[in-house]
Amino acid sequence: EWEHKIRHDPQFVEALSKRGIDNPDLVIIDPWPISNFGEESEKGKRLAIGRCWLRREETDNGYARPIEGLSPILDLNKSEIMEIQDFGVVPIPPNDGNYAARYQSDFRTDIKPIEITQPEGPSFEVQGNHVKWQKWQMRIGYTPREGLVIHTVGYEDQDRLRPIIYRAALSEMVVPYGDPTNDHYKKQVFDSGEVGIGKCANSLELGCDCLGEIYYFDVALHDIRGNALNMQNVICMHEEDFGILWKHSDNRIGETETRRSRRLVVSTIATVGNYEYGFFWYFYQDGNIDYEVKLTGILNSAAVPPGVTPKNGTLVAPQVVAHNHQHYFNVRVDMMIDGLKNSVYEVDTVTDPISENNMHGNAFSTKKTLIKNERDAPRTIDPFAARTWTVNNQSSTNYMGEPVGYKIAPGENVLPFHHDNAVIMKRAAFMTGHLWVTAYN
């Protein structure tokens, strides 16, 4: 509806004509929520800005040819076009960048098929939204804002189910861009809170999105008018071989023992404009849990005049720039290690001082620091200290007499590159730390 309304707005049509575009129906417009910069015109309004591209034909790659400097401003509450901003004409990039199979003349022939078969079926059991697999138990959920939600994760230890996680889900994500020109500084969308990552779900296809013996979960959503919408095959669950779990060779007696690793994969994929986000929860036979976000799709593109080398981005095609940007994903995990009495410790590896007990200076050890309250957060990663965090239950001990716990091991990460005074640093303050800890109340 918005796209049709904008395409045929007289002021927008006039701006297209200035750029040599005489068919508005070939223009695609993605509405992006506008950041609040405290301007008078923004107060009390829900605004969006239209990002525009031009197709050569209806099935063309929509993101290859950006229409630079033309931005309709939308008042979502009034369902009106508030303003058409025109920063001046920049030539439309020449290349189509078509990737669809129908545009390709031939394909590679040097790859052989991989067949994944489980003649006896998968090892998991599903009843409704309850899943059992290799001593794991959990419930699978979904919301329009968060997307995939994992509930009540537990592990069967002998004859009892031991709780680990009460609830885990993406709580927010934001993608701030780093180009100050025209209105690109307003590109800082909260894809969860403002857009609703769960509403952007794909219906997954066997053999492409998911491979093997697949179990799908459907989800119940609603459309823009509040009508019920049942989406099929939104959540994919399957098993994967994951290489060697454990191995040891005893050369003295000539024996080798090897155990294969298998993991349970629960995933969903969302399309937000030009980008696809894949969200994957992995559960392993050794008790490990991983969370991974896979980013694919198409880079968000803007146009520059011929011969211009952009400072705040990379040329990806003639006259097409992909602006510098960062993707931040905030995952809320309500831990429940053997119950509710959990504490969080920061664990750093430290060098022991030279002393009578460390005369050669080779000793190092770990230092555990209790995170006592919210004021102790946020915490940041420190690869030079091999920093991790552990969630412990001091009232429950393992067979060695130590408090039971789970280690939180960070992966590759950075901090924001924006100036401290940038608006996004206030709007998305969670970016300033890698771990935030708060007691449930």
Name the predicted role of every residue range:
Residues 1-38:
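Short, non-transmembrane alpha-helical segments in secretory-pathway proteins
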Residues 1, 17, 55-148, 152-288, ...:
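Extended effector regions of multi-domain proteins
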Residues 2-10, 46-52, 72:
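Short, structured motif recognition centered on aromatic/hydrophobic residues
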Residues 34-48, 360-364:
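Short, charged low-complexity intrinsically disordered segments located at boundaries
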Residues 41-54, 264-268:
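A short hydrophobic beta-strand element
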